Each structure stands twice: as C-alpha cells, then as structure tokens.
C-alpha cells in the first residue's frame, strides 16, 4: 500500500477525485467491459499462430471440418494445411471515410494430392502433391473498440442467448389432456442435426419423434439400434424368479420389494410355512428389515398373486421349438393353465409393481407392430422420407446419418458435457454424436421421472441457456459458406484434368465471401451501432438477445422466458431491458459477468475457507453455483474477516434462506455484480422502484453529448470505468513525455517499452467533430500539456460525454421541487433562461448529405456551378466546382452541391427542326437535380469530401482536399522523424562523448577525445563516421545506425503508402462517376418540447423557458435552474432523485466552503485550513484518494477542481445512508432537512413553506422537438389510395382518423368534414382545382369522388358485387320526364 501511496502522491488534475461512500472492499477487478466481443472474435480468427500450431477451434475448426475434400471417384483429395492473414488494405479511419469494409485478406494454404488407383485391388498410391496459397476473400476485422466497419458504418454483432445443446426433461404441466395428467417428455437437442423427442402419451405409451415428424413407438427406435424384445425388457426391468412349491409359488424375499407394502394376504415363510406377517398390515421399512434379520429367505405366494404380472422370458418347448408364451405376456387364468400344462416349475417374472416401477416399456412393446430391426428401420425411413420405397441399405444409411454421422450430427462439446452431467455418463467431450448408451439412458431417465423419481429441467435456468458470441456466430456462418463451396469443388474436381490443375483452379471463394458479407450486412444480430453516447455503445456491445436466427420470435415467446430467474443473479441484469414487445428477450450482461469457453455466463465469488472470507476469487456458472451456499457481498464480517452472524442470509439452489455460517462456502464479490453497467451508474438505485430504474437505465443511453460535458457531483464510481473501456476517452498506450499537443493530435515520446522494431513515438489523432451513427457529435479534447509525464493507461484526452476521464452524460443543475403556475403539470419541466444563455444543454448534431453523379442512358450527370434557371444569389456559397464552401451558413432549400441531369429529348416541332438544321446542334436539355437542404434544417457546413472514380479527372475542390490531406500526413511524418532523430542522436552522443575517436569525418584529426563542442562542428549526419577503439561499443553504434535507417525507411514507406492511397481514385458503386458528401453541423439549444430526464426514470418535456428574474431564488440571490413537480415522486416511488438532490446540495455547499478557503490561500498563502478541510472530507482508507500524501501544489489543484462542487461516489447497494447525507449537509453548513426558504422571482415574496432544493443531474435526451416538428402543404401521395403518405421521413401529412371524423360529425361541421375527406385527402381532380382556385385568389371549389371510394368499389367488384354510380341530377331529370310523358 505504501508504494502506491508514494506513486499517487502527485495529483495532475487530469482525473476527477471522488469522495467514496462505499464500505465493502473491492476484491476482484471488474473485467474489461467489451471483453465479450473482443475475446470471442480473437479466438475465432486467431491471427497470430501460437507455437505448436492452432488448436481446433474457430476458423481452424471450420476448415478442418470441411476439408479434406475428395472427388467422386477417389482419385484426388484437397487437404487443408493452414491459413494466414495479410495486412488490411485500409485502416479503420480510411474505411470510415471511403465507405469500405475494414477487413484483411485471408490466404488459405491447400494441398492437392492425386492418387494412382489400382483398378483390380483398389489400392491407392500417391502420384502427385501440389501445395498453394489460395485467396479466400476478405475477413472483417474488429476495431479496438469491439465494433466492425461494414461499408463505412460501425456495426455491432450482438451476442445471442439460445438453448444449450444437451438433453432436457420436461412435462406439459397437465395441459394436453383433459384429466390434467402430466405427460413427461425428453428432448435431445444437438448443436446441429436432427432433434430427438421421446414422450409419453395419455395412455402411458412411450413414443419417439425425429425432427418433430410423425411419432413412432420408442421400442422401434431401440430395435433400429439393434436390440430385440428380450434385450429391451432385460435392459429396463429386473427379473424375479418364481419356483413352484406345492399349490403355490415361492419367491426370494427382499426388503426393497416388500417395504411400505400393504399386505393383501398373509406373508408366509416358504421354508417353515409359518405366517410372519398378517394380511391387512402395512410393512414398514423397519419391520421389513427385521424379517430379513430373522432369516427370512423366501416367501410363499398363491397362484392368484401371479395374475397381472408379466413374463420375462419366452416359455418354449425345446423339443419342437414351439413358443407357448412370449416374453412380456400378461399372466391371466389361461396363462396359468398353459404353465400348468407344460409343467413349468420355474418362471421369470418382470419386476413390475405398478407403484414404484411401471409397465410402460412393456406396454409400448405390445403396441409396437414392428418385430425386427428391418421393420423398425423401414418404419423410421417412411416417417422421414414419405413416398420413397425403402431398401435395407438406404434405410440403414439414413438412420445412421440422423444421429451417428459426425458430418450431419454435432452435439458439440457443450452438449456432451451437459448430457454427461444430467445422466451421470462418462464420455469424453470429443464424442460429438449420439451413442446407443445415450438413447437408452434418456429413455431410462424418462421412465424414472414417470415413476416419480428425479426432477424435470427448468429451461429458463442459465445452466440450460448459453451465449453465442461474435466468434461462434461467425464460425457457423463461415461453415455454411464453405459447405456451399465444397459442392462446387467436388464437381470441378471431377470435370477437369486433375493432373494439370493447381488448388487455385479448383476453388471459387465467392460463396464463402458471400456468406460473410451476408452475415455482416443483413443478419438480425448484426446491428447498426447505437452511438448516441459512450454508454449506449458499451451497452450495445454487452447486449444479449434471445431473438435472431435459431432463437425465439417475439410473438411466440411466453412469460416464463422473459421473466427474471434466480440464476440471473450476477449474470444478467434484472433491471435493464427494453419496455415493449421485446421486454425480457433483450438483456444486458451484469457488470462482473463473463462468458466461459462453453458459452455459459459465469459470475465471480469469494471463497470462504473454514469460516474465513478469503480474497481468492473463483468464477462459477449457474450449474456449478447451485451446489453452494452463497452469502451476500454486504454480509457483516468481524475484524478477522469471518462472518459475524450465527445465521447468514444466503442463496442456495435458487432459493434465498438463512443458513448456519459453517454451511456458507462462497460470498459475492461486490454488491454491483447484480446489475448491468447502465444500472450501476444510477446513484441510490436501492431507493428506486424497479420500473423507474429500468427507465433510468434505458434513458441514460439516449442522452445526447453536450457541448460542455460535466461529470455528476453524485456519481457511483463506475463513471471512469465506462469512459475508459468504451474508448471514448483516449488512454496512453505507453508511458512517456508529451512532446506536442494541439486540438487535433497529441504526440508522446515513449519512455518505456522501447522495442527497436516499433517507433519510439506515439501519435494520437483526435477525432474532431465527426458524425456518429445517430448524428451526434464525436469530438475529443486534449487534457495534457507539453512536457507532462504520462503513465500507461492515463487518460490524455476527453471524448464525447466525458469530463476528466469520467462519463458525463448531462449537467448538474439547481433544482427546486415545487409546483409553478401549472407549468410542471404532468411531469413538465420549467427551465431558467440561464440554461439557454450559458449553453448548459446545448448539443451539436452533424447531418450527412450525399450526392452522386451517375452515368445515365441520356449521358453523364455533372456536378457544376452552372445550373439552369437558378439565381446567382442561390449560388453565392458554391465554389467553381459547384460544391459549397466550408463554414457556409445554410438554411432550408439552400443548394449544397449543384448537379445537372440530361433530360430526355422532347419531340420537336417542324419549325424547331428547320432552325436546328440551319443553326447546327443545340445543347441538349438538362434539368436541375442539385442537392438542397431539407425543410426545417439549418446549420453550418463543417466538412466536405469529394470522391472520384478511377480515371475520372479531379476537379479543383478535390485537388485542394487532397493537398490538405497530404500536408497533414507530411507533418505527421516530419514530427515523428524529428523525435526519432532527437532520440537516436542523443543516444549516439551519450555513446561517443568522452571516447577517443580513431577516425572521423573529413577534416577531423585522428585519436582525439570527443566532446559536444567537437561534435558540434560537424552536421549530425556525419557523426556516424566517428570510429572508436572499443569494438563492442562500435558494434552497438553500428546496430543503432542500422536500426535508425530501418526506422527512417519504414516511416517514409508508410508515408508514401498513405499518399498513394489519397491520390488513387476511389472504389465506386457501378455507374457512379463522382460522389460528394457534405457534413452540416447544427447547434441545438434546449427549447420547449425537448425531452429531459434524470437518472431515476424521472422524465419530462420542457414546457416553458422562464426569464431568470421570474425564477424562484434563494436567500443569497441564486436563482433555481429548473423547477420540478413534487407530485412526480411519491406515486413513482423513485425516491433516489430526492436523496441525490440532498447530497448534490451538500456537495455544492462543501464546494463553496472549499472555494472560500482557496481564496484565503491565494490572499494569505496559508494552506493549512484548506488542507484540514479536504483531509476531513476524504477518509483515509483504500477507497479514497490519499490526500494526506499530497504536496501543496497537488492539494491546490484538487481544491480548484472541488470548488465548483465536491464529487462523490455512492456505489449501488453500498452507498451513502441518510445519516451520511445529514452529516455532509451539516459539514457544509446547510440545514439537515435539505430544505430552504425560496422567494418568488415575480413578487420577491418568500413562499409559504420551505422547499427542497439541491443539485440533480439532468440529461437531454435524443428526442428533440426539432427532429419531430413537421408541416406539409403538398407532397407525395400513395399510389393506390392517392392519400398523402404518413410520417416526417416521407414528408407525409397528418392523419385525420375515425375519431377525428366523429368529432366533426358531433359538431355538425358538414363542409369542413367533406373538405377533409375529399380535396384535402384523395379527391385527385378536386385538389388540383382547389390549388388553381387558391392561385387565382378564388374561394369556390367543388368536391368530387375520393379515390379511396373507387378502391372500395373495385374491391366489391372483386367479390362479384357490382356497384354503379349514376349522376343524381340526370336521374331526377329522367324521372321528371317519364312522369310528364305518363300524364
């Protein structure tokens, strides 16, 4: 401990120091939060081949399972040797910019072996072997942050939860049959291959189903495995031998058989004939044992006792071979007579008592019509392939391929391990197919369950569900691709001259590459990354989905699957899951959880040995944990680390119980191991209702990064971990000294891990105003200064939503809980104008607009400034190439990129033809297809990118962008070169100074002692010419020179590569000649209609922004920033927000006190009061920063950080209690009630009673009114109904639904209603007329027939109901005419 104190006694101001309220020591370190993704994919790719070759897993296993491939005649074989990856063509940043996939070319080394086959003997000799590396497409690589870049966008592969392979026993809970009888079933689920179901029906007959096809009696399946009827009976039942004894029979006496039996007749000793127990008596276990001890060997039973039992063996006449009775026959009166006739003195009976042992297998045998193996195989063949005539060979081959062929059936290691565990088998996990013993064991277990022994499985237990992460999903996908390829290879091997071809000629890698592309592009589990803020990224990578291929569907998932299960504890978060149809199907991994090699989620526990809690940590899966008694992390311990309570609350086998302390053998590692990352960021989570905590977790992921990030006063200690692991904040890769810093990059001269092959310089490029997937702004800001020392892992730059390396999703604002003129009714939020003026909740959003110039049939489109019929005013912001300048302010309708498209030739009049013939060719017509700003969008152009196809001449703008990029690369190269020079020449100087030089550059007198002055006379490049006597030193100098030259060359090579990439044309989609992307940044201040939320599920919409002077204010004149409704708390039961408010108030009060002492120190130079105050605040324990070791400067830096408000950490389930909050309020000189007198800003009068005031952390969510507000006059219409489309994205209209129609009907507003249903909607002719009338300034129009009425008429006609419309006026006229003619 002393050592760490000495190291941290300097404070650099680059991290946020928090007062820690947790009491429980952190024993285990939290695993890296994106380990799930990285470890899984690394294991799949295994880029670096380990010593001794790659193990059979991941990509290696896929190739091994498909290769070797032989042709149909067996004359050639293609073997897999190994694979390797070349380096990726483009780095991550280049792929993002050019819309490419970040991937590395995969090269597979294959060996083609050609055989000479002897036609007579069939023996093979190797004729020829060829080996070759074959390109097999590109394999996407994972970025350091656990994402993939596919076509320029970041995507995440979400892990999938599915049912583990293995065997499951279950029953239908009495639902299938009217009697409510439980029908038991077993199901063997492989990783891939046919499912096998074995189930009881209502008559207790056991059936088997293969792949949910028609059922067959299970005995047919056993016969197909090669058993006959007597084998089956002897496998499942014991035999009891009955010997004839006078007029009755004698049977051996066994305690197990007779215990608990109620005797129907007297129990008679067969040897002595005496009655040892009387009829009607129940034999207890004790009595049964007593009889055995007295020497009872056999008992006598009457003939009647045989009735209803079953024969175990056939009764045969051995002379004639005639079978009198078959095994399994029931004994009745007739059977007894046959036994008497054939004089059978000894018979074997099946040990079935219908109580402990049922006759299910025997009854199934009797129902089964199949008698032999052939019948059974044919029956199974007919079920699997109906309509095909079976032969013995095809039936046998088909049955073998179902369960016993490793090509077709794979239990996987997990499935085998699960089967061994469930049925006490002992089979190595390399046996991945079913064996006869497995099927027998399943049937036996099922019968045991029906007999009331054993337990059914719980499919929602995490011991029976496993996680498929990226690597495994990818492995399955690649296998599909290779299998598609295999067919093509086989056909090609047969069709070509095999002696002359190379492996390259046999392989078409397209199917494999297509399978990978399809998986990353369109799989349900490959998702567009949620990049709103760092927390949403991290949560997305830790997500577990039960949906997706091979998983559940929303509609079919029941309540049980979605519910929280006791095994979720410490593995899956019980809080964080979406609201809505996906609830419970999409989950989040708990903070400390990890996935083991079998795909089961493990949680860490501390071992308890002899009652003492150790610091040894073990990870257990749900199956292993159920055997232990696990104490909670907050169980009270004594000074020696033993459990202090006599009885301890603990978990065991899914139950919570009080157990004696000597039973307890494990303890939780941390109280937050129960929840996910997002839930662990909510302070006072323990005081919030679960529903609101769920909303809080989900809403933190929607928080928009603000222009000025500010970490919360009241945190949980998780903030720095999330910022570090998400990759938002930049951490130093190696220790070193900061050499240069500007807004775009940090250059650090490494001082450790100086590998000659690596550069001694780390250049960190910072992302400046990049667009995220959700259009939020990614911007990194340096925290270090030139000359700063940084250690490996230190945070050197803040990213979006981070503040000094802490996650900062929102801002601390001064809140008052009180109603204010109804403006905070129904969760509305009242804000102060200060919030807007000081840009407290201002965020920057970056929109991307893309335009492509294509080659059309009528000619190429052109990007140009020369646009027909556009005023010069509209072109003022475009450069000569027709592309907007950076920095231009744009508004709706402004041109971003000018583009013209050739128009089709319109037919010419004879006059035009004549004129054209006289004056020559007129320029073909073009129309304006420029890209304009969409309605409602304002902003500033921040970046423009121009992409040209190979061979297309670049315009001026593209050249300028290219020059700029090359200059940037050159600066990087020069900086790295100068640091390299400085380092190398400093080392060379150290080597040479003080040594005698035998030789030197031109003009140097030999054998002179060198010093810096002498060396200073020569240029540095000539210093290498100095030669010293010491041979060893001279060799070192030579080595240094070689290394220096290599580094210089490598640097230049890297630079030239990058320049070449910049100058090269871009890959474009077919038909696209040129593409321009324009990025427009919008500054969004908070405004009424924006959604805000706290961390406790307390969400609301801003209702009004009030002038500062009208806001309620404190006694010292400080105005509240935000006013919330107190009625939003009690019914929602999220009291955490109130505790946070009080604690935040104390933090701010304490900050003020520290600020006063800082001012005092600046005036008087006396630091002692400040030191005492900070030391009193920060306890001296392992959790807190060792402020007592700080020197004065460090303490001053810390005080400056604290003066805005002291930051504290209150971990979930182990945080500050009420007493702690009271104490802190009193320390800060505030009222311990947390309430103060507030004054009304409008009148200056105090309010009637004290009001709760404090600091609360509020977030601005990504539901902004600017993105939602929308208006339309005319726009696109639906093709069929001719009604306007819906939604902002389609520029649609507002739906006037049936309820709105009722409202107008109720008002009797007939004309308004007619207008709504006709001209404003789908009366095509009518709406044109209205438009014309408005243009004319007229206000008369007539409504016609709505198009939707015509659709209705057409639909009725399709039902053979003809509807014709007649003109009413004509009808009336006709009627009148007919009336007059009649008269």
Swiss-Prot record:
GO molecular function list: DNA binding; DNA-directed RNA polymerase activity; ribonucleoside binding
Recorded GO CC terms: DNA-directed RNA polymerase complex
Regions crossing the membrane: none
InterPro entries recorded: DNA-dir_RNA_pol_bsu_ext_1_sf, DNA-dir_RNA_pol_bsu_external_1, DNA-dir_RNA_pol_su2, DNA-dir_RNAP_su2_dom, DNA-dir_RNAP_su2_hyb_sf, RNA_pol_bsu_bac, RNA_pol_bsu_CS, RNA_pol_bsu_protrusion
GO biological process: DNA-templated transcription
This enzyme's EC code(s): 2.7.7.6
Pfam families recorded: RNA_pol_Rpb2_1, RNA_pol_Rpb2_2, RNA_pol_Rpb2_3, RNA_pol_Rpb2_45, RNA_pol_Rpb2_6, RNA_pol_Rpb2_7
Annotated keywords: DNA-directed RNA polymerase, Nucleotidyltransferase, Transcription, Transferase
Protein function: DNA-dependent RNA polymerase catalyzes the transcription of DNA into RNA using the four ribonucleoside triphosphates as substrates.
HAMAP family in the record: RNApol_bact_RpoB
Subunit structure: The RNAP catalytic core consists of 2 alpha, 1 beta, 1 beta' and 1 omega subunit. When a sigma factor is associated with the core the holoenzyme is formed, which can initiate transcription.
Family (UniProt): Belongs to the RNA polymerase beta chain family.
Protein's name according to its UniProt entry: DNA-directed RNA polymerase subunit beta
């Amino acid at each position: 401990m002393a050592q760490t104190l000495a190291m941290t006694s300097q404070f650099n101001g680059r991290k946020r120091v928090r007062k820690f309220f947790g009491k429980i020591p952190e024993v285990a370190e939290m695993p890296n939060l994106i380990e799930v993704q990285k470890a899984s994919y690394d294991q799949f790719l295994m880029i670096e081949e380990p010593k001794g070759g790659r193990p059979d897993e991941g990509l290696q296993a896929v190739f091994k399972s498909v290769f070797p491939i032989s042709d149909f005649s067996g004359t050639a074989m293609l073997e897999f040797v190994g694979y390797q990856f070349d380096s990726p063509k483009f780095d991550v940043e280049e792929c993002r910019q050019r819309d490419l996939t970040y991937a590395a070319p995969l090269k597979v080394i294959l060996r083609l072996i050609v055989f000479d086959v002897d036609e007579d003997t069939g023996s093979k000799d190797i004729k020829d072997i060829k080996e070759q590396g074959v390109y097999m497409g590109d394999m996407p690589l994972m970025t350091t942050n656990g994402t993939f870049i596919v076509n320029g966008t970041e995507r995440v592969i979400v892990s999938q939860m599915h049912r583990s392979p293995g065997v499951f026993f279950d029953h239908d809970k009495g639902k299938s049959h009217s009697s409510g009888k439980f029908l038991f079933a077993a199901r063997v689920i492989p990783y891939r291959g046919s499912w096998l179901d074995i189930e009881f029906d209502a008559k207790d007959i056991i059936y088997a189903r293969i792949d949910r096809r028609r059922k067959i009696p299970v005995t047919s399946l056993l016969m197909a495995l090669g058993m006959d009827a007597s084998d089956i009976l002897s496998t499942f039942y014991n035999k009891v031998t009955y010997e004839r004894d006078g007029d009755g029979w004698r049977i051996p006496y066994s305690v197990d058989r007779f215990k608990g039996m109620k005797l129907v007749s007297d129990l008679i000793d067969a040897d002595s004939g005496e009655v040892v127990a009387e009829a009607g008596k129940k034999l207890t276990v004790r009595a049964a044992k007593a009889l055995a001890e007295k020497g009872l060997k056999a008992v006598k039973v009457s003939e009647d006792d045989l009735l209803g039992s079953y024969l175990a063996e056939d009764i045969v006449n051995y002379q004639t071979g005639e079978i009198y009775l078959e095994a399994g026959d029931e004994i009745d009166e007739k059977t007894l007579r046959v036994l008497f006739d054939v004089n059978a003195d000894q018979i074997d009976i099946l040990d079935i008592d219908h109580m402990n042992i049922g006759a299910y297998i025997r009854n199934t045998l009797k129902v089964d019509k199949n008698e032999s193996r052939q019948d059974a195989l044919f029956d199974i063949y007919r079920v699997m392939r109906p309509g095909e005539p079976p032969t013995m060979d095809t039936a046998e081959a088909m049955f073998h391929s179902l369960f016993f062929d490793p090509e077709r059936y794979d239990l996987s290691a997990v499935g085998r391990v699960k089967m061994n565990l469930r049925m006490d088998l002992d089979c190595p996990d390399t046996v991945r197919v079913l064996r006869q013993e497995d099927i027998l064991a399943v049937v036996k277990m099922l019968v045991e369950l029906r007999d009331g022994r054993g337990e059914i499985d719980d499919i929602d237990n995490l011991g029976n569900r496993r996680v498929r992460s990226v690597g495994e999903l990818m492995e399955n996908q690649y296998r599909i691709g290779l299998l598609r390829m295999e067919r093509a290879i086989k056909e090609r091997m047969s069709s070509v001259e095999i002696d002359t071809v190379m492996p390259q000629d046999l392989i078409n890698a397209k199917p494999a590459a297509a399978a990978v592309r399809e998986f990353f592009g369109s799989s349900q589990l490959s998702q567009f990354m949620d990049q709103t803020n760092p927390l949403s990224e991290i949560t997305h990578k830790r997500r577990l989905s039960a949906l997706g291929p091979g998983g559940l569907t929303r509609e079919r998932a029941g309540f049980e699957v979605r519910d929280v299960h006791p095994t979720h504890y410490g593995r899956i978060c019980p809080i964080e899951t979406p609201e809505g149809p996906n609830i419970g199907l999409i989950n989040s991994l708990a903070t400390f959880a990890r996935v083991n090699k079998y795909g089961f989620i493990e949680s860490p526990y501390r071992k308890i040995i002899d009652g003492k809690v150790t610091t040894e940590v073990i990870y257990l899966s749900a199956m292993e944990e159920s055997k232990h008694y696990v104490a909670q992390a907050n169980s009270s311990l004594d000074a020696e680390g033993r459990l202090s309570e006599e009885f301890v609350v603990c978990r065991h086998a899914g139950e919570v119980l009080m157990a004696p302390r000597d039973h307890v053998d494990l303890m939780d590692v941390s109280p937050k191991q129960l929840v996910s990352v997002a839930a662990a960021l909510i302070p006072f989570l323990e005081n919030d209702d679960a529903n609101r905590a769920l909303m809080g977790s989900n809403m933190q992921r929607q928080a928009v990064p603000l222009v000025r990030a500010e970490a919360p006063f009241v945190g949980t200690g998780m903030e720095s971990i999330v910022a570090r692991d998400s990759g938002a904040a930049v951490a130093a890769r190696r220790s070193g000294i900061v050499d240069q810093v500007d807004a775009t990059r940090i250059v650090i001269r490494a001082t450790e891990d100086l590998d000659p092959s690596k550069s001694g310089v780390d250049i960190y490029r910072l992302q400046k105003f990049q667009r995220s997937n959700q259009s939020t702004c990614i911007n990194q800001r340096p925290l270090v200064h030139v000359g700063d020392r940084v250690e490996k892992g230190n945070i050197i730059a803040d990213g979006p939503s981070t503040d000094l390396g802490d996650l900062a999703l929102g801002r601390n604002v001064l809140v008052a809980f009180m109603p204010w003129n109804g403006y905070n009714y129904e969760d509305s939020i009242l804000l102060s104008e200060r919030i807007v003026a000081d840009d407290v909740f201002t965020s920057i959003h970056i929109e991307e607009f893309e335009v492509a110039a294509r080659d059309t049939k009528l000619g190429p489109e052109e990007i140009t400034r020369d646009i027909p019929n556009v005023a010069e005013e509209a072109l003022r912001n475009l450069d000569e190439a027709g592309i907007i300048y950076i920095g231009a302010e744009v508004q709706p309708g402004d041109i971003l990129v000018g583009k013209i498209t050739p128009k089709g030739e319109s037919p010419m009049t004879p006059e035009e033809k004549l004129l054209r013939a006289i004056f020559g060719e007129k320029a073909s017509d073009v129309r304006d297809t420029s890209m304009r700003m969409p309605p409602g969008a304002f902003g500033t152009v921040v970046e423009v990118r121009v992409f040209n196809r190979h061979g297309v001449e670049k315009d001026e703008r593209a050249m300028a962008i290219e020059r700029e990029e090359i200059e940037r690369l050159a600066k990087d190269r020069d900086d790295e070169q100068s640091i390299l020079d400085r380092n190398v020449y400093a080392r060379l100087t150290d080597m040479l100074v003080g040594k005698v030089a035998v030789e030197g550059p031109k003009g140097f007198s030999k054998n002179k002692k060198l010093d810096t002055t002498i060396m200073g006379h020569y240029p540095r490049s000539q210093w290498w010419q100095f030669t010293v006597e010491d041979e060893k030193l001279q060799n070192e100098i030579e080595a240094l020179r070689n290394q220096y030259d290599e580094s210089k060359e490598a640097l230049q090579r890297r630079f030239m590569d990058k320049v070449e990439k910049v100058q090269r044309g871009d890959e474009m989609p077919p038909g696209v000649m040129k593409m321009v992307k324009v990025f427009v940044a919008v500054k969004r201040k908070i405004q009424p209609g924006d959604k805000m939320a706290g961390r406790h599920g307390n969400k609301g919409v801003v209702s009004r922004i009030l002038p500062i002077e009208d806001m309620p204010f404190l006694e010292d004149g400080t105005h509240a920033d935000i006013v919330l409704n107190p009625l939003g708390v009690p019914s929602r039961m999220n009291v955490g927000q109130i505790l946070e408010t009080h604690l935040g108030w104390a933090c701010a009060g304490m900050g003020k006190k520290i600020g006063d002492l800082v001012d005092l120190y600046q005036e008087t130079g006396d630091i002692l009061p400040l030191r005492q105050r900070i030391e009193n605040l920060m306890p001296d324990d392992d959790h807190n920063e060792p402020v007592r070791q700080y020197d004065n400067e460090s303490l001053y830096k810390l005080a400056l950080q604290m003066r805005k408000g002291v930051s504290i950490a209150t971990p979930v389930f182990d945080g500050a209690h009420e007493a702690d909050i009271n104490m802190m309020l009193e320390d800060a000189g505030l009222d311990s009630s947390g309430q103060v007198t507030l004054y009304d800003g409008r009148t200056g009068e105090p309010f009637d009673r004290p009001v709760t005031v404090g600091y609360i952390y509020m977030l601005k969510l990504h539901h902004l009114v600017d993105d939602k507000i929308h208006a339309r006059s005319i726009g696109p219409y639906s093709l069929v109904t001719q009604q306007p489309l819906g939604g902002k994205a389609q520029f649609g209209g507002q739906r006037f639904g049936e309820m709105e129609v009722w409202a107008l009907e109720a008002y009797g507003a007939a004309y308004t209603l007619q207008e709504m249903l006709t001209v404003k909607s789908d009366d095509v002719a009518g709406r044109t007329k209205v438009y014309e009338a408005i243009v004319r300034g007229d206000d008369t129009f007539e409504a016609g027939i709505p198009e939707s009425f015509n659709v209705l008429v057409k639909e009725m006609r399709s039902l053979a109901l003809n509807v014709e419309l007649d003109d009413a006026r004509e009808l009336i006229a006709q009627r009148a005419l007919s009336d007059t003619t009649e008269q």
